[in-house]
């Protein structure tokens, strides 16, 4: 049974019904409508914490979705799931795929930076300053790109860039 038919929350169910009605009226191909339905169900499963089900829906959406912009968000959400499960290498791969489809996706860049910053801090604690600096440099590069795309966002990242002497690389 599709996830949209199992929702017990009245507001969510109402939104889903309205979204289905709008989707049916839109002048787009049937395949695009199906891709969106899978994507929507994937987001609902992800929000409920059912990551395995969300991945199934997202993978079905990827099979059908032809639009690069829309595919970028599917890849991004798959990356979020893998990051939440601690599979950072897999998450990085999906964030990279999202950026290949849509280079103007600052949230993917931010998440790439967060993973590299986390890794840098971890190896720094283990007494490996050279490896830490490699990760911090990757984090800085990703945050700089994200801030350039969304200058009013990522304030903590901007502060980190300033306090580590990397902020001038932004300009």
UniProtKB/Swiss-Prot annotation:
Localization of this protein: Cell inner membrane
Gene Ontology CC: plasma membrane
Keyword Membrane: yes
Record flagged with keyword Repeat: yes
TPR repeat positions: 35-68, 72-105, 120-153
InterPro entries associated with the record: PSI_Ycf3_assembly, TPR-like_helical_dom_sf, TPR_rpt
A UniProt-annotated Pfam family: TPR_16
SUPFAM superfamilies: TPR-like (SSF48452)
Source taxon at top rank: Bacteria
Gene3D superfamilies: Tetratricopeptide repeat domain
Coiled coil (residue ranges): none
GO biological process entries: photosynthesis
Keywords assigned by UniProt, alphabetized: Cell inner membrane, Cell membrane, Membrane, Photosynthesis, Repeat, TPR repeat
Disulphide-bonded residues: none
Topology term for the membrane: Peripheral membrane protein
Function: Essential for the assembly of the photosystem I (PSI) complex. May act as a chaperone-like factor to guide the assembly of the PSI subunits.
Family according to the record: Belongs to the Ycf3 family.
UniProt protein name: Photosystem I assembly protein Ycf3
Species annotation: Gloeobacter violaceus (strain ATCC 29082 / PCC 7421)
């Amino acid at each position: 049974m599709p996830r949209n038919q199992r929702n017990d929350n009245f507001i969510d169910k109402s939104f889903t019904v309205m979204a289905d009605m709008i989707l049916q009226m839109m002048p787009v191909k049937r395949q695009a409508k199906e891709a969106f339905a899978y994507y929507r169900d994937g987001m609902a499963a992800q929000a409920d914490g059912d990551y395995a089900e969300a991945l199934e829906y997202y993978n079905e959406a990827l099979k059908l979705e032809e639009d690069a912009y829309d595919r970028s968000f599917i890849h991004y959400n798959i990356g979020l799931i893998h990051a939440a499960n601690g599979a950072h290498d897999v998450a990085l791969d999906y964030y990279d795929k999202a950026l290949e489809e849509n280079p103007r996706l600052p949230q993917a860049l931010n998440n790439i930076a967060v993973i590299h910053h986390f890794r840098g801090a971890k190896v720094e604690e283990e007494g490996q300053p050279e490896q830490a600096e490699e990760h911090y440099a990757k984090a800085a590069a990703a945050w700089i790109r994200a801030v350039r795309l969304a200058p009013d966002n990522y304030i903590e990242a901007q502060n980190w860039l300033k306090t580590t002497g990397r902020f001038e690389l932004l300009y």
